[in-house]
């Protein structure tokens, strides 16, 4: 994600109107259906886009606004950095994770999942994240810092991948548009709160899981929609926690 401001430009309304026309007059046929393969970033321009089937995973901190009330800013910065650092490290360790974004206290990844086994792998990513939080909370307690609770949401669907920003400014970003991103974000905002477990997935994720992962999730109704939730952990990380976090 590129967001660094490299150069200051004088804004001119005439140039602005011309750029709007260039964008809005782009050919709809330049938006291609790539199905299950996420194209490389260098294939994106300011006038094209790719439709692709992906799995999105969001993780965010529960009640993060309350952390700002009870912690000094340097403390809060260290807590956030530790959380964000290890969320990115875990997602980045999986080859199928093609995009990672940080938005405030939320980290989300876009995963290429053309096979059923890939969907199981995303559940393994969620389990790693969940186990990592246990280790982080142990270290936070040792510092007498507040501990963190998180919510993780996972959804599979079709997204439109586009490049957005101001051409020539160095300020641009890959934007993922569609229900897959919005729904995964919504699930993360529900997970870990009230009676909900840490991890929530949709029905189209659940039906593609192996029997073992299915057995670790239970169903509930979210209005008229069935969801699945669990508190899945990574066994080797749990063993490390028991051995080293005493």
Regions found by a protein language model. Give the residues of each.
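Intrinsically disordered, glycine/charged-rich C-terminal tails and inter-domain linkers
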Residues: 1-42, 183, 192-246
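Catalytic NTP-binding/metal-coordinating core of nucleotidyl cyclase/transferase enzymes
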Residues: 42-124
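Catalytic core of nucleotidyl cyclases, primarily class III adenylyl/guanylyl cyclases
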Residues: 94-118, 138-177
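Serine endopeptidase catalytic core focused on the charge-relay Asp
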Residues: 129
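Alpha-helical oligomerization segments
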Residues: 186-187
């Amino acid at each position: 994600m590129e967001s660094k401001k490299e150069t200051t430009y004088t804004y001119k309304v005439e140039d602005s109107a011309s750029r709007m026309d260039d964008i809005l007059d782009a050919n709809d046929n330049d938006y291609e259906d790539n199905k299950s393969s996420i194209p490389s970033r260098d294939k994106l321009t300011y006038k094209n886009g790719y439709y692709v089937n992906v799995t999105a995973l969001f993780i965010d901190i529960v009640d993060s606004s309350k952390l700002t009330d009870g912690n000094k800013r340097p403390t809060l910065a260290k807590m956030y950095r530790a959380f964000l650092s290890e969320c990115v490290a875990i997602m980045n360790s999986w080859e199928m994770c093609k995009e990672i974004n940080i938005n405030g206290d939320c980290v989300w990844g876009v995963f290429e999942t053309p096979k059923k086994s890939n969907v199981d792998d995303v559940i393994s990513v969620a389990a790693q994240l969940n186990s990592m939080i246990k280790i982080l909370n142990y270290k936070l307690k040792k510092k007498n810092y507040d501990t963190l609770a998180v919510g993780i949401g996972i959804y599979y669907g079709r997204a439109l991948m586009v490049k957005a920003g101001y051409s020539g400014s160095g300020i641009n970003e890959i934007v993922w548009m569609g229900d897959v991103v919005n729904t995964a974000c919504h699930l993360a905002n529900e997970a870990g709160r009230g009676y909900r477990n840490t991890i929530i997935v949709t029905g189209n994720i659940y039906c593609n899981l192996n029997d073992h992962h299915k057995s670790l999730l239970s169903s509930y109704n979210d209005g008229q929609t069935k969801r699945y939730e669990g508190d899945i952990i990574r066994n080797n990380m749990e063993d490390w926690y028991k051995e080293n976090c005493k």
